[in-house]
Regions:
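Detector for small/aliphatic-rich hydrophobic stretches
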Residues: 2-12, 16-192
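Mature, solvent-exposed C-terminal subdomains and processed small-chain segments of exported/organellar
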Residues: 301-312
Length: 312
């Protein structure tokens, strides 16, 4: 089979900002023994951690629970694609990253807000099942370094969560402990009255977690003095193919969804690989050196791109 590619490192970011909201209090998640409300930070300590909870591996999550979470996330991925595909140009998004970021809000939501988030993100599990399941999937993709398997050479995957709160807002300790324990998200204090400094602090965090590939995630004007909470999720992925492409890049024709021909730089190789087909499409599977990771590429039949999109 003859394959061509123009792939580059994948970087996905989910960012959520919230205006004033009710302080979290949950009967489902109790404070850790010995956990006490964090002391108000001083102005010069605006990046101080506000929960001592460490990111922990969950107790065994049943396979059926993980399967239900994965199925819902797949449905959400298609829902989101249909919503954003109308914009021109190429797009890259990480449904799991978005689900993880919004789940950190969902943990503190109740009533109608909780219901609407669950409907939009296809969360069908109860909260006390959902968060441990998300934690299990996240740790499977990006295990903590102590005792973790050594990644294959040429493989990099980093998943990081952060939460930034208004310095004088009364966030509840059980909520902060949940974010630290389940999502590894330590809250940092910011004073959003100084929107520029807050923006720079968060952007520096994102830049650090994406090896400098994204330096200006939050544009001027997004944060205001009314902002109370910012949640950020960053994913950085770069890996070598199991079977490398030949170093022979050349100009080749490519056909975007609009059917027009453009010329792009491509590499190619002939190889045995996973292949499948169905009504109106063909698909191939490309393996990375790290056996956990594979890329599936789907090619709709010529002239049927929009019809194929509608079928998703």
């Amino acid at each position: 089979m003859h394959l061509t590619t123009t792939l580059a490192p994948i970087i996905c970011i989910a960012i959520v900002t919230l205006l004033p909201l009710a302080a979290y209090s949950s009967p489902q998640f109790s404070p850790k023994p010995g956990s006490a409300p964090p002391p108000p930070p001083q102005k010069e300590e605006l990046a101080a951690v506000t929960s001592s909870a460490e990111h922990n591996a969950p107790s065994r999550v049943p396979a059926a629970v993980l399967a239900e979470l994965s199925a819902g996330n797949t449905d959400f991925a298609y829902d989101l694609y249909r919503a954003i595909r109308k914009k021109s140009g190429s797009l890259c998004y990480s449904p799991f990253s978005i689900s993880t970021a919004v789940a950190m809000i969902y943990a503190g939501a109740r009533g109608e807000t909780e219901r609407q988030i669950a409907d939009a993100l296809r969360f069908t599990l109860a909260q006390d099942q959902l968060h441990p399941a998300l934690n299990a999937l996240g740790l499977d993709l990006d295990p903590p370094s102590p005792g973790a398997p050594v990644p294959e050479p040429g493989f990099a995957l980093s998943i990081a969560n952060s939460i930034w709160g208004q310095v004088d807002y009364p966030f509840q300790t059980p909520y902060l402990d949940l974010l630290g324990d389940i999502y590894g998200a330590r809250m940092g204090w910011l004073d959003f009255a100084d929107a520029q400094q807050s923006r720079l602090t968060i952007n520096n965090w994102v830049s650090d977690r994406t090896s400098g590939h994204i330096e200006h995630l939050i544009a001027p004007g997004i944060l205001t003095r009314d902002t109370r909470l910012v949640l950020a999720n960053a994913v950085y992925f770069k890996a070598e193919w199991e079977t490398p492409f030949l170093q022979a890049t050349r100009e080749e024709p490519f056909y975007p969804g609009d059917g027009k021909q453009v010329t792009v730089a491509m590499m190619s190789r002939r190889t045995m690989t996973g292949y499948g087909w169905g009504a109106g499409y063909q698909a191939v599977e490309l393996r990375y050196k790290d056996e956990r990771m594979r890329m599936t590429i789907v090619l709709p039949a010529k002239g049927t791109f929009e019809e194929f999109e509608r079928s998703l």
